[in-house]
């Protein structure tokens, strides 16, 4: 599933190309993706100018000059790409936006776990994103903030940093990578982290996400940016997907476990932990 770096990469690839264009037509090829598509989607943004393209958590947001915004979640296999006027529709193209420069913005989703909504722009934070935590790069992500969120929670730290009510956008890949960089065992209880570990974890999350964005995200299978190009952070992964391989830091063996049904990868030496944790 695309995480924060992939959506940030998508935003960066589309923003300058879309701002100022008008949506001249919206074609819904089906009436549902993960959830039912609103029939109003085709009318609420019709003949409107694109003012901005931005990101919140793992959502791509396109703002229009009629005070509506388009909210896009890629799900497991979604692709949101800009195509030329002579583009031939593909099998899993579900929503097509015809733009005033002749190009088409295509939402393609093989597994149909993606989501597209239109929503009043000024109500997004209060109503649509009201349950989301803070952004990893926000100045609000401080030792005090994260310590307060962790100190009463006995859950494994990996689960906690993937909880969008705590920090948004840190999915499975980047949680494993960040914890390895911070040398924190993924099973360690959030409430057991020392202040220096919390500060190091915040820095590690930001460092990993920054490198991933610079590399254009991680493409394991489906992700491409708005120009239909894959991400290359896969080549920089240190533990994720490396089960049985040697740790690049200490040469110990990378271990694979499960947290809430998700694969977790860590180094048994760099991320050594005395006590066990029952999940």
UniProtKB/Swiss-Prot annotation:
Zinc finger (FPG-type): 238-272
NCBIfam families, sorted: fpg, PRK01103.1
Assembly: Monomer.
Annotated residues for binding of DNA: 92, 111, 153
Cofactor(s) required for function per UniProt: Zn(2+)
Upper taxonomic lineage: Bacteria, Pseudomonadati, Pseudomonadota, Alphaproteobacteria, Rickettsiales
Protein name, as recorded: Formamidopyrimidine-DNA glycosylase
Protein's UniProt keywords contain Ribosomal protein: no
One of the GO biological process terms: base-excision repair
GO molecular function, one term: damaged DNA binding
Keywords, ordered alphabetically: DNA damage, DNA repair, DNA-binding, Glycosidase, Hydrolase, Lyase, Metal-binding, Multifunctional enzyme, Zinc, Zinc-finger
Superkingdom of origin organism: Bacteria
Keyword Nucleus carried by entry: no
Catalytically driven reaction(s): Hydrolysis of DNA containing ring-opened 7-methylguanine residues, releasing 2,6-diamino-4-hydroxy-5-(N-methyl)formamidopyrimidine; 2'-deoxyribonucleotide-(2'-deoxyribose 5'-phosphate)-2'-deoxyribonucleotide-DNA = a 3'-end 2'-deoxyribonucleotide-(2,3-dehydro-2,3-deoxyribose 5'-phosphate)-DNA + a 5'-end 5'-phospho-2'-deoxyribonucleoside-DNA + H(+)
Source organism (scientific name): Rickettsia massiliae (strain Mtu5)
Function field: Involved in base excision repair of DNA damaged by oxidation or by mutagenic agents. Acts as a DNA glycosylase that recognizes and removes damaged bases. Has a preference for oxidized purines, such as 7,8-dihydro-8-oxoguanine (8-oxoG). Has AP (apurinic/apyrimidinic) lyase activity and introduces nicks in the DNA strand. Cleaves the DNA backbone by beta-delta elimination to generate a single-strand break at the site of the removed base with both 3'- and 5'-phosphates.
Gene3D superfamilies: 1.10.8.50, MutM-like, N-terminal
InterPro entries for this protein: DNA_glyclase/AP_lyase_DNA-bd (IPR015886), DNA_glyclase_Znf_dom_DNA_BS (IPR015887), Formamido-pyr_DNA_Glyclase (IPR020629), FPG_cat (IPR012319), MutM-like_N-ter (IPR035937), Ribosomal_uS13-like_H2TH (IPR010979), Znf_DNA_glyclase/AP_lyase (IPR000214), Znf_FPG/IleRS (IPR010663)
Family named by the database record: Belongs to the FPG family.
Cofactor note: Binds 1 zinc ion per subunit.
UniProt-listed Pfam families: Fapy_DNA_glyco (PF01149), H2TH (PF06831), zf-FPG_IleRS (PF06827)
Catalytic site positions: 2-3, 58, 262
